[in-house]
Amino acid sequence: VVQFQIQWVGTPNYTSGRGGRAPVAIVDHITAGLYPGTLNWMQNPAAQASAHYLILQDGRILQLVRDEDTAWANGYVERPTWRLYDGTNPNRYTLSIEHENLSGGHLTEAQYQASLWLHKQLIERWDIPISRDTIIGHNQIDTVNRPHDPGLEFPWNRLFLDLQEWQGGEQGVEPWKEQLVEQARQEGLITEYHNPDEAASKWFVLAVALNLLKKLGK
């Protein structure tokens, strides 16, 4: 079993404590930039931005903010699709992982293995269930300004399958079905994650059809 080390780097961009809350979900991001520029940005007080962790393409894991404190990663909310959003600042009850990546969300193998390991650590430490509501993308909090964060190539299917196998659970939905759902969401045909194996209600079919017509400018 590969063991990873977490390197503390710190940042002034955080709020002490969590206002009485505890983490209920992990939010995955991509940096849209490369190291060391991305780290410098998250350590710059003028940026007013940070994350708990930054995973580099070579597999190194950097920690900027303690789990017990509030990182400034998900505070801007617009048209959220995240079902656990309760109307308050999501930073208070989420853990954020940034992945060094210019765009698209494709991770190197070293980066993926580091991310998988870190997800396992956080799931165990904070008793976070493995689900699409508790391991999410930044785009589910801000669908308007962050529609492609962490991107279409982010390995959601592999991540969930590996996490489910690690916990000894079901293998879950086949990856190709998950990919279809994610592509439909990215294209605006649906607004949130849906289980591909659940039957579609009439209202859902109509909603997809109307979204398609809107996309076509009808």
Question: Residue ranges of each PLM-predicted region?
Answer:
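Sec/Tat-exported extracytoplasmic proteins
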Residues: 30-32, 65, 122-127, 163, ...
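N-terminal catalytic cores of peptidoglycan-degrading enzymes
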Residues: 1-90
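Exposed alpha-helical structural elements
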Residues: 37-38, 158-162, 179-180
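Solvent-exposed, acidic/flexible segments
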Residues: 21, 46, 87-90, 104-112, ...
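Short, solvent-exposed alpha-helical surface patches in non-cytosolic proteins
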Residues: 170-218
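Basic/polar, cationic surfaces and motifs that engage anionic cell-wall
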Residues: 1-8, 15-16, 92, 100-172
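Secretory-pathway/luminal and periplasmic proteins that interact with or process carbohydrate-rich
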Residues: 35, 142-149, 191, 214-215
